[in-house]
């Protein structure tokens, strides 16, 4: 088993990869086929055993039905949320709740 990546950036990226795939209604196997990769490739990315290279990100975004710019903005938003103090995150969540 490889090293599990746990930096804030890694956590945000893994969350984005998983959430975007699930939002598209894709299984890991279906996404892997779109990428012309084995299912283990997607699993390793989502579980932190592999890092998504910057050069691979545009193709990954396209396979998820996203423009690379949207993919990048979602990542930046998740990264900001991860680094935001918990008190501020709670306030934002309360403001969003009806």
Q: Model-derived features: where do they sit?
A:
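DNA major-groove recognition helix of helix-turn-helix
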Residues: 46, 56, 75
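Recognition helix of helix-turn-helix/homeodomain-like DNA-binding domains
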Residues: 35-52
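Short, charged recognition helix plus adjacent turn
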Residues: 2, 62, 70-98
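Short basic helix-loop element that most often maps to the first helix and adjoining turn
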Residues: 15-34, 59, 86-96
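A short, Lys/Arg-rich alpha-helix, primarily the initiator
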Residues: 1-23
